[in-house]
A protein has these predicted regions:
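GH16 jelly-roll
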Residues: 12-321
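Classical Sec-dependent N-terminal signal peptides that target proteins to the secretory pathway
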Residues: 1-10
Length: 321
């Protein structure tokens, strides 16, 4: 589904038009670079002297010293298992099982990390119709401020696909007291919209969030071209940028009014998570079963990569305070 924004009533923020699409505040980005037909609109890489760590996916192996897998369809909270990861998600996340530390749902090919949800005709473990992959750097690689985190990606198409690139606190702390930073998440149903969000508060039923989407022209949609999203992270502030844009489409500061009720939790160490969920609350449980791969080769699709979350590179670099 394409969203056309030319005739939407708008306001302005940071020089961008601000509209509301499906009830969500959405920044309209019409970059000069979009006038050129490119395979990738990702920003230029940082000066090597500024780079703390980078992931190029240049070998076929997922580095076990950096990446670990989440496995299952949920988690334990106070001794009780929470199915669907708290979001009514349908997929079962599988572990790496080869010498390459990959599996049918996650592999590295041609310098790209590829994550593909698979719809199983016979339920996986007799219970789950979908499998996928979710990797994390917890206890292996930490991220903190002042820094900038950038990743270059192409989103998967298909209603029900939910790719995400996000941060959670390294310490053991009840969600969302330590905060959650969703640098990028997208709905497979919406081809030219991606979003960012932060979550914070005292508990599951006593919390708040800030959500900001970004919409781009149909000619450069997130599901057909590579784009980058960068989070610039300083003490007491977060700014998020699309591609090579000099202005952020999302800005959060500790003195924003929303933090008068809940404390600002984002001055701490976090770990990185990359995953593709299936279904769930994010797109109101919408799902199109025919949109998904049916096997590891995705042989039921003419262009398998269209149905995979593709990541070209990740960069973690120094930033002046």
């Amino acid at each position: 589904m394409l969203i056309f924004f030319q005739n939407l009533e708008s306001q302005e923020v940071n020089g961008y038009d601000l509209v509301e699409i499906e009830g969500v505040s959405t920044v309209v980005v019409e970059s000069e670079s979009f006038r050129e037909n490119r395979a990738s609109y990702c920003k230029q890489r940082s000066n090597p002297n500024e780079v703390i760590w980078a992931e190029e996916f240049s070998s076929g192996k997922l580095d076990k010293e950096i990446w670990d897998y989440d496995v299952s369809n949920g988690f334990y909270d106070k001794g009780k298992f929470v199915y669907g990861w708290g979001n009514s998600e349908l997929q079962y996340y599988r572990k790496g099982k080869t010498d390459q530390n990959t599996n049918e749902n996650l592999f590295i090919e041609n310098g790209l990390l590829k994550i593909q949800p698979i719809h199983h005709r016979r339920a996986f473990q007799k219970e789950f119709d979908y499998t996928s992959a979710r990797i994390k750097t917890r206890n292996l690689k930490q991220f903190t401020y002042p820094s900038k985190i950038t990743f270059c990606f192409k989103a998967p198409t298909g209603t029900g696909a939910w790719p995400a690139f996000w941060l959670m606190p390294e310490e053991n702390i009840a969600w969302p007291q330590g905060g959650e930073i969703d640098i990028m998440e997208a709905k497979g149903r919406l081809t030219n919209i991606a979003g960012s969000a932060i979550h914070f508060g005292e508990g599951f039923h006593n919390k708040d969030e800030i959500v900001q989407n970004v919409v781009i022209p149909p000619s450069v949609r997130f599901q057909e071209k590579f784009h980058s999203i960068t989070m610039e992270w300083r003490e007491d502030s977060i700014q998020i940028f699309l591609d090579s844009e000099s202005k952020p489409y999302m800005t959060v500061k500790s003195d924003d009014e929303v933090f008068s009720k809940f404390s600002y939790p984002f001055n701490r160490n976090y770990y990185l998570i990359i995953n593709v969920a299936v279904g769930g609350k994010y797109d109101d449980h919408r799902i199109n079963r025919t949109a998904f791969c049916l096997n590891s080769k995705c042989s039921n699709k003419d262009n398998p990569d269209d149905h995979r979350f593709l990541i070209d590179w990740i960069e973690y670099a120094r930033l002046e305070p």
